[in-house]
Amino acid sequence: MELRERDVELIVSEVLKRLGPSGGTQGAPASPVGDFGLFDSLDDAVAAAEAAYKKVSSMAMRNKVVAIIRKTGLAHARMLAEMAVQETGMGRVDDKITKNTLVSEHTPGPEVLAPRAMSGDSGLTLEENAPWGVIASVTPSTNPAATVINNSISMISGGNAIVFAPHPGAKRVSQSAIQLINKAIIEETGIANLLVAVKEPTLEVARRLFAHPGVKLLVVTGGEAVVEAARKHATMRLIAAGAGNPPVVVDETADIRRAARSIYDGASFDNNIICADEKEIIAVESIADQLKQEMKALGAVEISLEQSDAIARFALRDYPGPNVAANPKWVGRNAALIAKEAGISVPESCRLLLVDIGRDINHAFARVEQMMPVLPLLRARNVEEAIAWAVLLERGLGHTAGMHSRNIDNMHSMALQMNTSLFVKNGPHLAALGAGGEGWTSMTISTPTGEGVTSARTFVRIRRCVLVDNFRIV
Protein backbone atom coordinates (compact mmCIF):
# COMPACT_ATOMS: atom_id res chain seq x y z
CA MET A 1 0.00 0.00 0.00
CA GLU A 2 1.42 3.36 -1.03
CA LEU A 3 1.23 6.03 1.66
CA ARG A 4 0.50 9.64 0.86
CA GLU A 5 2.45 12.37 2.62
CA ARG A 6 -0.44 13.40 4.86
CA ASP A 7 -1.09 9.75 5.81
CA VAL A 8 2.53 9.34 6.91
CA GLU A 9 2.42 12.50 9.01
CA LEU A 10 -0.74 11.34 10.77
CA ILE A 11 0.69 7.87 11.49
CA VAL A 12 3.91 9.25 12.97
CA SER A 13 2.01 11.82 15.00
CA GLU A 14 -0.29 9.14 16.41
CA VAL A 15 2.62 6.81 17.28
CA LEU A 16 4.47 9.60 19.08
CA LYS A 17 1.32 10.59 20.94
CA ARG A 18 0.80 7.03 22.20
CA LEU A 19 4.36 6.88 23.48
CA GLY A 20 3.74 9.64 25.98
CA PRO A 21 4.56 13.27 26.75
CA SER A 22 7.72 14.90 25.40
CA GLY A 23 9.07 15.61 28.84
CA GLY A 24 9.55 11.88 29.41
CA THR A 25 9.10 10.09 32.68
CA GLN A 26 10.14 11.35 36.04
CA GLY A 27 13.89 11.82 36.20
CA ALA A 28 14.29 12.91 32.57
CA PRO A 29 16.63 15.88 32.11
CA ALA A 30 14.88 19.20 32.33
CA SER A 31 17.19 21.24 30.10
CA PRO A 32 17.38 21.42 27.20
CA VAL A 33 14.33 19.34 26.28
CA GLY A 34 13.63 19.72 22.56
CA ASP A 35 10.93 17.93 20.61
CA PHE A 36 11.89 14.29 21.24
CA GLY A 37 15.42 15.01 20.13
CA LEU A 38 14.72 17.77 17.60
CA PHE A 39 16.03 21.28 18.32
CA ASP A 40 15.87 24.67 16.64
CA SER A 41 19.48 25.42 17.59
CA LEU A 42 22.60 23.34 16.94
CA ASP A 43 24.13 24.54 20.20
CA ASP A 44 21.06 23.36 22.14
CA ALA A 45 21.15 19.99 20.38
CA VAL A 46 24.82 19.44 21.23
CA ALA A 47 24.29 20.56 24.84
CA ALA A 48 21.37 18.15 25.22
CA ALA A 49 23.44 15.28 23.83
CA GLU A 50 26.30 16.14 26.18
CA ALA A 51 23.97 15.92 29.16
CA ALA A 52 22.47 12.66 27.88
CA TYR A 53 25.59 10.57 27.28
CA LYS A 54 26.61 10.85 30.93
CA LYS A 55 23.45 8.92 31.84
CA VAL A 56 24.56 5.78 29.97
CA SER A 57 27.87 5.28 31.74
CA SER A 58 26.85 1.86 33.08
CA MET A 59 26.86 -1.19 30.83
CA ALA A 60 23.52 -2.24 32.30
CA MET A 61 21.89 0.97 31.10
CA ARG A 62 23.52 0.72 27.67
CA ASN A 63 22.23 -2.82 27.29
CA LYS A 64 18.75 -1.66 28.25
CA VAL A 65 18.79 1.28 25.81
CA VAL A 66 20.10 -0.86 22.95
CA ALA A 67 17.33 -3.40 23.56
CA ILE A 68 14.81 -0.55 23.35
CA ILE A 69 16.29 0.66 20.04
CA ARG A 70 16.14 -2.85 18.59
CA LYS A 71 12.51 -3.25 19.64
CA THR A 72 11.58 0.17 18.25
CA GLY A 73 13.34 -0.45 14.95
CA LEU A 74 11.53 -3.75 14.47
CA ALA A 75 8.15 -2.35 15.50
CA HIS A 76 8.36 0.49 13.00
CA ALA A 77 10.39 -1.18 10.23
CA ARG A 78 7.54 -1.08 7.72
CA MET A 79 6.36 2.42 8.52
CA LEU A 80 9.87 3.86 8.25
CA ALA A 81 10.42 1.95 4.99
CA GLU A 82 7.23 3.38 3.51
CA MET A 83 8.16 6.85 4.68
CA ALA A 84 11.61 6.58 3.10
CA VAL A 85 10.26 5.56 -0.31
CA GLN A 86 7.51 8.18 -0.14
CA GLU A 87 9.89 11.00 0.77
CA THR A 88 12.95 10.15 -1.33
CA GLY A 89 11.42 8.23 -4.23
CA MET A 90 14.31 5.78 -3.93
CA GLY A 91 14.33 2.06 -3.35
CA ARG A 92 11.67 -0.54 -2.61
CA VAL A 93 9.54 -0.79 0.51
CA ASP A 94 10.07 -4.52 1.05
CA ASP A 95 13.84 -4.19 0.71
CA LYS A 96 13.91 -1.25 3.11
CA ILE A 97 11.93 -3.31 5.61
CA THR A 98 14.65 -5.95 5.27
CA LYS A 99 17.34 -3.33 5.91
CA ASN A 100 15.55 -1.86 8.92
CA THR A 101 15.06 -5.35 10.34
CA LEU A 102 18.63 -6.38 9.62
CA VAL A 103 20.20 -3.42 11.42
CA SER A 104 17.81 -3.77 14.35
CA GLU A 105 18.70 -7.42 14.85
CA HIS A 106 22.32 -7.73 13.72
CA THR A 107 24.10 -4.54 14.73
CA PRO A 108 26.44 -5.52 17.60
CA GLY A 109 25.77 -4.01 21.01
CA PRO A 110 27.83 -3.50 24.19
CA GLU A 111 28.70 -7.20 24.28
CA VAL A 112 31.57 -6.63 21.81
CA LEU A 113 33.34 -4.17 24.13
CA ALA A 114 35.43 -6.46 26.29
CA PRO A 115 38.23 -4.87 28.35
CA ARG A 116 41.78 -6.23 28.02
CA ALA A 117 44.09 -7.07 30.90
CA MET A 118 47.82 -7.82 30.74
CA SER A 119 49.94 -8.96 33.67
CA GLY A 120 53.64 -9.66 33.96
CA ASP A 121 56.70 -9.20 36.12
CA SER A 122 56.20 -5.43 36.09
CA GLY A 123 52.59 -5.40 37.26
CA LEU A 124 49.10 -5.17 35.76
CA THR A 125 47.81 -3.16 32.80
CA LEU A 126 44.12 -2.69 32.03
CA GLU A 127 42.74 -1.31 28.76
CA GLU A 128 39.10 -0.23 28.67
CA ASN A 129 36.68 1.18 26.11
CA ALA A 130 35.77 4.77 26.95
CA PRO A 131 33.13 6.90 25.21
CA TRP A 132 33.99 9.86 23.04
CA GLY A 133 30.96 11.68 24.46
CA VAL A 134 29.08 13.46 21.68
CA ILE A 135 29.41 12.03 18.17
CA ALA A 136 28.15 13.81 15.06
CA SER A 137 26.69 11.46 12.44
CA VAL A 138 25.93 12.61 8.90
CA THR A 139 23.42 10.19 7.34
CA PRO A 140 22.44 9.62 3.68
CA SER A 141 19.16 9.72 1.80
CA THR A 142 19.75 6.20 0.45
CA ASN A 143 19.56 4.34 3.78
CA PRO A 144 18.00 6.95 6.10
CA ALA A 145 16.17 5.07 8.85
CA ALA A 146 18.51 2.07 8.70
CA THR A 147 21.56 4.28 9.26
CA VAL A 148 19.92 6.07 12.20
CA ILE A 149 19.04 2.73 13.84
CA ASN A 150 22.43 1.20 13.12
CA ASN A 151 24.48 4.19 14.27
CA SER A 152 22.34 4.60 17.39
CA ILE A 153 22.96 1.02 18.50
CA SER A 154 26.70 1.15 17.77
CA MET A 155 27.39 4.57 19.25
CA ILE A 156 25.22 4.29 22.37
CA SER A 157 26.76 0.85 23.01
CA GLY A 158 30.04 2.74 23.34
CA GLY A 159 28.48 5.14 25.86
CA ASN A 160 27.99 8.05 23.46
CA ALA A 161 25.13 10.32 22.41
CA ILE A 162 24.63 11.32 18.79
CA VAL A 163 23.93 14.57 16.95
CA PHE A 164 22.48 13.44 13.64
CA ALA A 165 22.74 15.51 10.47
CA PRO A 166 20.32 13.80 8.07
CA HIS A 167 20.43 14.39 4.33
CA PRO A 168 17.85 17.13 3.63
CA GLY A 169 16.22 14.87 1.04
CA ALA A 170 15.40 12.33 3.77
CA LYS A 171 14.78 14.76 6.63
CA ARG A 172 11.29 13.61 7.57
CA VAL A 173 11.96 9.89 7.75
CA SER A 174 15.30 10.38 9.52
CA GLN A 175 13.81 12.72 12.10
CA SER A 176 10.84 10.39 12.61
CA ALA A 177 13.25 7.55 13.40
CA ILE A 178 15.10 9.80 15.85
CA GLN A 179 11.86 10.83 17.57
CA LEU A 180 10.44 7.31 17.77
CA ILE A 181 13.62 5.96 19.33
CA ASN A 182 13.89 8.89 21.75
CA LYS A 183 10.29 8.50 22.83
CA ALA A 184 10.75 4.79 23.51
CA ILE A 185 13.94 5.40 25.51
CA ILE A 186 12.27 8.13 27.57
CA GLU A 187 9.25 5.91 28.21
CA GLU A 188 11.35 3.08 29.66
CA THR A 189 14.38 4.84 31.19
CA GLY A 190 13.59 8.54 31.60
CA ILE A 191 16.71 9.43 29.59
CA ALA A 192 16.10 12.04 26.89
CA ASN A 193 18.19 13.20 23.94
CA LEU A 194 20.59 10.33 23.36
CA LEU A 195 19.74 11.05 19.72
CA VAL A 196 19.36 14.67 18.63
CA ALA A 197 19.14 16.68 15.43
CA VAL A 198 18.45 20.20 14.23
CA LYS A 199 14.92 20.60 12.87
CA GLU A 200 16.04 22.29 9.65
CA PRO A 201 19.24 20.72 8.28
CA THR A 202 21.16 23.13 6.07
CA LEU A 203 24.66 23.35 4.62
CA GLU A 204 25.54 26.01 7.17
CA VAL A 205 24.37 23.80 10.06
CA ALA A 206 26.50 20.95 8.70
CA ARG A 207 29.58 23.16 8.44
CA ARG A 208 29.10 24.38 12.01
CA LEU A 209 28.66 20.80 13.18
CA PHE A 210 31.93 19.77 11.51
CA ALA A 211 33.79 22.24 13.72
CA HIS A 212 31.59 22.35 16.84
CA PRO A 213 33.68 22.32 20.04
CA GLY A 214 31.14 20.09 21.79
CA VAL A 215 31.53 17.30 19.22
CA LYS A 216 34.46 14.93 19.73
CA LEU A 217 34.08 12.57 16.75
CA LEU A 218 32.58 13.06 13.27
CA VAL A 219 31.12 10.14 11.33
CA VAL A 220 30.05 10.69 7.72
CA THR A 221 28.05 8.16 5.71
CA GLY A 222 27.59 9.40 2.16
CA GLY A 223 29.13 10.07 -1.23
CA GLU A 224 32.42 11.59 -2.28
CA ALA A 225 31.18 15.20 -2.07
CA VAL A 226 30.09 15.08 1.58
CA VAL A 227 33.21 13.15 2.58
CA GLU A 228 35.43 15.78 0.95
CA ALA A 229 33.46 18.58 2.64
CA ALA A 230 33.96 16.88 6.00
CA ARG A 231 37.68 16.48 5.38
CA LYS A 232 37.93 20.14 4.50
CA HIS A 233 36.00 21.55 7.45
CA ALA A 234 36.28 18.99 10.28
CA THR A 235 38.31 19.99 13.32
CA MET A 236 37.95 16.63 15.09
CA ARG A 237 38.70 13.02 14.16
CA LEU A 238 36.78 11.86 11.08
CA ILE A 239 35.40 8.41 10.28
CA ALA A 240 34.15 8.46 6.69
CA ALA A 241 32.06 6.01 4.71
CA GLY A 242 32.33 7.05 1.09
CA ALA A 243 31.42 6.00 -2.42
CA GLY A 244 32.23 2.79 -4.24
CA ASN A 245 31.83 1.25 -7.69
CA PRO A 246 31.94 -2.46 -6.84
CA PRO A 247 32.80 -4.84 -9.67
CA VAL A 248 31.96 -8.53 -9.62
CA VAL A 249 34.04 -10.97 -11.68
CA VAL A 250 32.72 -14.33 -12.87
CA ASP A 251 35.30 -16.77 -14.20
CA GLU A 252 34.93 -19.98 -16.22
CA THR A 253 35.07 -22.21 -13.11
CA ALA A 254 32.13 -20.58 -11.32
CA ASP A 255 28.79 -22.15 -10.51
CA ILE A 256 27.02 -19.99 -13.09
CA ARG A 257 23.47 -20.50 -11.83
CA ARG A 258 24.52 -19.61 -8.29
CA ALA A 259 26.50 -16.61 -9.54
CA ALA A 260 23.50 -15.37 -11.52
CA ARG A 261 21.21 -15.63 -8.49
CA SER A 262 23.68 -13.85 -6.22
CA ILE A 263 24.32 -11.00 -8.66
CA TYR A 264 20.64 -10.60 -9.50
CA ASP A 265 19.64 -10.48 -5.83
CA GLY A 266 22.47 -8.11 -4.90
CA ALA A 267 22.27 -5.67 -7.81
CA SER A 268 18.48 -5.37 -7.67
CA PHE A 269 18.20 -5.05 -3.88
CA ASP A 270 16.61 -1.69 -2.98
CA ASN A 271 17.24 -0.61 -6.58
CA ASN A 272 21.03 -0.80 -6.14
CA ILE A 273 21.37 2.18 -3.78
CA ILE A 274 23.63 0.45 -1.25
CA CYS A 275 27.23 1.41 -2.02
CA ALA A 276 28.39 -2.20 -1.66
CA ASP A 277 25.93 -3.55 -4.25
CA GLU A 278 27.23 -5.04 -7.49
CA LYS A 279 27.63 -2.17 -9.96
CA GLU A 280 29.15 -3.95 -12.97
CA ILE A 281 29.69 -7.57 -14.04
CA ILE A 282 32.95 -8.62 -15.66
CA ALA A 283 32.47 -12.12 -17.05
CA VAL A 284 35.00 -14.31 -18.79
CA GLU A 285 33.89 -14.56 -22.43
CA SER A 286 33.40 -18.33 -22.41
CA ILE A 287 30.59 -18.20 -19.81
CA ALA A 288 29.15 -14.71 -20.45
CA ASP A 289 26.18 -15.89 -22.53
CA GLN A 290 25.27 -18.60 -20.03
CA LEU A 291 25.44 -16.11 -17.15
CA LYS A 292 23.24 -13.70 -19.06
CA GLN A 293 20.64 -16.38 -19.79
CA GLU A 294 20.52 -17.45 -16.15
CA MET A 295 19.99 -13.85 -15.02
CA LYS A 296 17.23 -13.35 -17.58
CA ALA A 297 15.55 -16.51 -16.33
CA LEU A 298 15.43 -14.90 -12.88
CA GLY A 299 13.66 -11.82 -14.24
CA ALA A 300 16.39 -9.49 -15.46
CA VAL A 301 15.42 -7.76 -18.70
CA GLU A 302 18.17 -7.31 -21.29
CA ILE A 303 18.24 -3.97 -23.07
CA SER A 304 20.22 -3.01 -26.16
CA LEU A 305 23.15 -0.60 -26.33
CA GLU A 306 20.87 1.89 -28.07
CA GLN A 307 18.33 1.60 -25.26
CA SER A 308 21.04 2.00 -22.61
CA ASP A 309 22.15 5.15 -24.43
CA ALA A 310 18.60 6.50 -24.21
CA ILE A 311 18.59 5.83 -20.46
CA ALA A 312 22.00 7.40 -19.96
CA ARG A 313 20.85 10.65 -21.59
CA PHE A 314 18.44 11.39 -18.73
CA ALA A 315 19.75 9.19 -15.90
CA LEU A 316 23.33 10.50 -16.06
CA ARG A 317 24.54 14.08 -15.93
CA ASP A 318 26.94 15.44 -18.57
CA TYR A 319 26.47 12.31 -20.68
CA PRO A 320 28.41 11.61 -22.85
CA GLY A 321 30.81 14.29 -21.60
CA PRO A 322 33.97 13.90 -19.52
CA ASN A 323 32.31 14.65 -16.16
CA VAL A 324 29.51 12.11 -16.39
CA ALA A 325 27.81 11.36 -13.06
CA ALA A 326 24.55 9.93 -11.77
CA ASN A 327 21.52 12.21 -11.97
CA PRO A 328 20.13 12.29 -8.40
CA LYS A 329 16.60 12.45 -9.79
CA TRP A 330 16.97 8.88 -11.07
CA VAL A 331 19.10 7.29 -8.36
CA GLY A 332 17.32 4.34 -6.78
CA ARG A 333 14.27 4.47 -9.06
CA ASN A 334 12.46 1.31 -10.08
CA ALA A 335 13.73 -0.42 -13.21
CA ALA A 336 10.27 -0.25 -14.81
CA LEU A 337 10.09 3.51 -14.26
CA ILE A 338 13.55 4.05 -15.77
CA ALA A 339 12.64 1.89 -18.76
CA LYS A 340 9.34 3.71 -19.28
CA GLU A 341 11.10 7.09 -19.35
CA ALA A 342 13.33 5.73 -22.14
CA GLY A 343 10.36 4.36 -24.08
CA ILE A 344 11.19 0.73 -23.27
CA SER A 345 8.37 -1.68 -22.42
CA VAL A 346 9.15 -4.01 -19.51
CA PRO A 347 6.94 -5.74 -16.92
CA GLU A 348 6.07 -3.59 -13.93
CA SER A 349 7.60 -6.31 -11.76
CA CYS A 350 11.02 -5.94 -13.43
CA ARG A 351 13.74 -5.43 -10.80
CA LEU A 352 16.84 -5.23 -13.01
CA LEU A 353 17.85 -4.03 -16.47
CA LEU A 354 20.88 -5.80 -17.97
CA VAL A 355 22.99 -4.37 -20.78
CA ASP A 356 25.76 -6.30 -22.56
CA ILE A 357 28.47 -3.70 -23.27
CA GLY A 358 30.98 -6.15 -24.69
CA ARG A 359 34.56 -4.96 -24.18
CA ASP A 360 33.74 -1.26 -23.73
CA ILE A 361 35.36 -0.56 -20.35
CA ASN A 362 34.78 3.17 -20.91
CA HIS A 363 31.01 2.75 -21.05
CA ALA A 364 29.40 5.27 -18.70
CA PHE A 365 27.35 2.68 -16.81
CA ALA A 366 30.53 0.74 -16.00
CA ARG A 367 32.75 3.58 -14.84
CA VAL A 368 30.15 5.61 -12.91
CA GLU A 369 28.61 4.65 -9.57
CA GLN A 370 25.09 5.15 -10.91
CA MET A 371 23.18 3.44 -8.04
CA MET A 372 20.31 2.35 -10.27
CA PRO A 373 19.02 -1.10 -11.26
CA VAL A 374 20.81 -0.86 -14.63
CA LEU A 375 23.63 -3.40 -14.66
CA PRO A 376 26.33 -3.49 -17.36
CA LEU A 377 28.01 -6.76 -18.35
CA LEU A 378 31.56 -6.71 -19.71
CA ARG A 379 33.24 -9.60 -21.56
CA ALA A 380 36.89 -10.29 -20.72
CA ARG A 381 39.12 -12.70 -22.65
CA ASN A 382 40.32 -14.41 -19.48
CA VAL A 383 40.32 -14.06 -15.70
CA GLU A 384 43.53 -12.01 -15.67
CA GLU A 385 41.98 -9.40 -17.92
CA ALA A 386 38.74 -9.48 -15.90
CA ILE A 387 40.61 -8.74 -12.67
CA ALA A 388 42.62 -5.95 -14.32
CA TRP A 389 39.39 -4.35 -15.52
CA ALA A 390 37.86 -4.69 -12.06
CA VAL A 391 40.80 -2.82 -10.52
CA LEU A 392 40.46 -0.09 -13.15
CA LEU A 393 36.70 0.37 -12.71
CA GLU A 394 36.82 0.33 -8.90
CA ARG A 395 39.05 3.41 -9.22
CA GLY A 396 40.98 2.78 -6.02
CA LEU A 397 38.01 3.67 -3.83
CA GLY A 398 38.75 0.64 -1.67
CA HIS A 399 35.10 -0.16 -1.00
CA THR A 400 33.81 -3.52 -2.25
CA ALA A 401 34.49 -6.15 -4.89
CA GLY A 402 33.37 -9.71 -5.48
CA MET A 403 34.18 -12.84 -7.42
CA HIS A 404 32.41 -16.04 -8.39
CA SER A 405 34.88 -18.86 -8.91
CA ARG A 406 35.88 -22.34 -7.79
CA ASN A 407 39.55 -21.49 -8.31
CA ILE A 408 41.19 -20.48 -5.04
CA ASP A 409 44.20 -18.99 -6.82
CA ASN A 410 41.97 -16.72 -8.89
CA MET A 411 40.04 -15.52 -5.84
CA HIS A 412 43.26 -14.93 -3.94
CA SER A 413 44.76 -12.97 -6.83
CA MET A 414 41.72 -10.72 -7.16
CA ALA A 415 41.44 -10.12 -3.42
CA LEU A 416 45.07 -8.96 -3.29
CA GLN A 417 44.81 -6.71 -6.33
CA MET A 418 41.50 -5.09 -5.35
CA ASN A 419 42.61 -4.15 -1.81
CA THR A 420 39.00 -3.31 -0.89
CA SER A 421 37.49 -3.13 2.58
CA LEU A 422 34.94 -5.77 1.55
CA PHE A 423 35.66 -8.72 -0.73
CA VAL A 424 32.91 -11.28 -1.32
CA LYS A 425 33.45 -14.74 -2.76
CA ASN A 426 30.57 -16.73 -4.29
CA GLY A 427 27.72 -14.72 -2.83
CA PRO A 428 25.85 -11.42 -3.13
CA HIS A 429 27.80 -8.42 -1.89
CA LEU A 430 25.16 -7.92 0.80
CA ALA A 431 26.59 -11.02 2.47
CA ALA A 432 29.47 -8.82 3.65
CA LEU A 433 26.94 -6.83 5.67
CA GLY A 434 25.48 -9.81 7.49
CA ALA A 435 22.70 -10.53 4.97
CA GLY A 436 23.35 -14.16 4.06
CA GLY A 437 26.94 -14.18 5.26
CA GLU A 438 28.66 -14.46 8.62
CA GLY A 439 29.46 -11.30 10.53
CA TRP A 440 27.62 -8.27 11.77
CA THR A 441 25.61 -5.57 10.02
CA SER A 442 26.47 -1.93 9.52
CA MET A 443 25.27 0.87 7.25
CA THR A 444 28.51 2.80 7.79
CA ILE A 445 31.32 1.12 5.85
CA SER A 446 34.34 3.27 6.48
CA THR A 447 36.59 2.85 3.47
CA PRO A 448 38.29 6.26 3.01
CA THR A 449 39.51 6.36 6.62
CA GLY A 450 40.05 2.62 7.00
CA GLU A 451 37.80 1.47 9.85
CA GLY A 452 35.86 -0.92 7.58
CA VAL A 453 32.52 -2.36 8.73
CA THR A 454 31.86 -0.26 11.82
CA SER A 455 30.53 -1.45 15.17
CA ALA A 456 30.54 -0.29 18.78
CA ARG A 457 34.30 -0.97 18.82
CA THR A 458 34.76 1.78 16.22
CA PHE A 459 33.18 4.44 18.43
CA VAL A 460 35.20 4.16 21.63
CA ARG A 461 38.51 5.51 22.90
CA ILE A 462 40.99 3.01 24.29
CA ARG A 463 42.21 4.07 27.73
CA ARG A 464 45.04 2.34 29.61
CA CYS A 465 45.56 2.09 33.36
CA VAL A 466 48.87 0.70 34.67
CA LEU A 467 49.58 -0.59 38.18
CA VAL A 468 53.31 -1.10 38.59
CA ASP A 469 54.50 -4.18 40.51
CA ASN A 470 52.87 -6.30 43.21
CA PHE A 471 49.46 -7.12 41.75
CA ARG A 472 49.96 -10.59 40.31
CA ILE A 473 48.50 -13.75 41.79
CA VAL A 474 51.19 -16.03 40.35
Regions found by a protein language model. Name each.
Residues L16-G23, V46-S57, I69-A77, A81-A84, ...:
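Structural signal for hydrophobic packing residues in well-ordered secondary-structure cores
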Residues F36, I149-N150, E228-L354, G358-I361:
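ALDH superfamily catalytic-core signature
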Residues M59-K64, I191-L195, N271-C275, V301-I311, ...:
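Flexible, glycine/charged-enriched surface loops at secondary-structure junctions
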Residues E2-P32, A117, G123-V134, A335, ...:
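Terminal low-complexity tails and localization/encapsulation signals of metabolic enzymes
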Residues P115-R258:
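Rossmann-like NAD(P) dinucleotide-binding subdomain of oxidoreductase/dehydrogenase enzymes
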Residues M1-L126, S154, A297:
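N-terminal Rossmann-like NAD(P)+-binding subdomain of aldehyde/semialdehyde dehydrogenases
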